[in-house]
Structures are given as structure tokens and as C-alpha cells.
Amino acid sequence: MSLKKEEVLDAISEMSVMDIMQLISMIEKKFGVSAASSHISSVENVVTESESTQVEQTEFTVILSSIGGNKIPVIKAVRSITGLGLKEAKDLVESAPVTLKESVSKDDADNLKKTLESVGASVEIK
């Protein structure tokens, strides 16, 4: 069965934000790609790096690796960080490891990591 682009677009438009985030994650894993625009700049940085001596990374991705033993404080922290509702934040936390924020500054990434680690979560910055 072949789906038309319009049918796929209509199906996606009826999905919740959480379902769309999970779909994007599944597509990234299946095809080995990333939806982050920072990867385009990463390719440009590699080209520039080969021409110059050193390029410093300026955009970072914050990844919730695991929630630890205390799920409720982690859900509250994720809600405040992402602005999601309770159910969406809970679903997101339970699907760890998951990307929480992309293309953030080093300071913001460190602050998010400290916040999440203070409530028992394991966080990775890439």
C-alpha cells in the first residue's frame, strides 16, 4: 500500500505533540538521521575546522538518559524546562533516553543538567 504525501501529512496533523516527538525519534533511529538543524552547522564546522586550527562547539543538545529512582521530581523538572503538560512530560520522562532541548548554549545546557541531576536524573550533553 502506497501512501500519498498528503495522506501522511493529514495523519501527522491529527497527532498529539508527544506522538509527533516519538515519530521523529523513530524516524531518526530507522534512517540514521537527525531532525536537529545543528547537524547542518556541524557539517559546516567540520569543513571550517579542516581549514582552520580549531572550532569550538556553540550549540548543545540536552538528553535525559535515565530518571533514577524518583520519577515525580524529574517529571516536574521536565515540565518546567519544556513547558509540556503533566501527561506529556510523564510520557517523555518514561521514554528516556530522550532529547529534551536542542541547540542550546553551553551555559543553558549546564544549568539544565544541574537542575535535572539535582532531582536524581542522569543527563547527557552532546
Curated annotation (Swiss-Prot):
Gene3D superfamilies membership: 3.30.1390.10, Single helix bin
GO function term, MF aspect, one: mRNA binding
Keywords: Ribonucleoprotein, Ribosomal protein
Stored InterPro entries: Ribosomal_bL12 (IPR000206), Ribosomal_bL12_C (IPR013823), Ribosomal_bL12_C/ClpS-like (IPR014719), Ribosomal_bL12_oligo (IPR008932), Ribosomal_bL12_oligo_N_sf (IPR036235)
GO biological process: translation
Cross-referenced Pfam families: Ribosomal_L12, Ribosomal_L12_N
GO cellular component terms attached to this protein's record: cytosolic large ribosomal subunit
Record SUPFAM superfamilies: ClpS-like, Ribosomal protein L7/12, oligomerisation (N-terminal) domain
Annotated family: Belongs to the bacterial ribosomal protein bL12 family.
Role summary: Forms part of the ribosomal stalk which helps the ribosome interact with GTP-bound translation factors. Is thus essential for accurate translation.
Subunit structure: Homodimer. Part of the ribosomal stalk of the 50S ribosomal subunit. Forms a multimeric L10(L12)X complex, where L10 forms an elongated spine to which 2 to 4 L12 dimers bind in a sequential fashion. Binds GTP-bound translation factors.
Protein known as: Large ribosomal subunit protein bL12
